[in-house]
Amino acid sequence: LSPAALACALDNLQRLGLQHKVQLTQADLFADGRAALIVCNPPWLPARPSSPLEAAIYDPDSRMLRGFLSGLAAHLVPGGEGWLILSDLAEHLGLRTRAELEAWIAAAGLQVLARLDIRPTHGKASDKADPLHAARAQETTSLWRLAAL
């Protein structure tokens, strides 16, 4: 986690008045111990970044996503949940399939408790001049509520 990402998360918590209810921890992927709720918003596209800025968008070979899923159960308290925030843009671009994602979830010993979906309303979703318009017009961002089996 970059220091800038941590500072951004803290700023968001402060603006929402939640800084006293949430503990931010800088760690490689998981902090030591277990938690009742672990939230992950990994880079959405399985590709190699060419700059530090692109590291927020690209996840080579879906390493972070697969690492989060495979380690989640071991870091949750009994009854705890992992929340995965993920766009399906990679699916629309042919970079990953929904079946792959679901297989990684199952292989990690996790179950999907629920999924909340939202369609983007940002300008790129409706910009027909954007080279990715066809994919962005179909994109859905989901909050996957996961728990250990």
Residues of each region from the PLM?
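S-adenosylmethionine
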Residues: 3-145
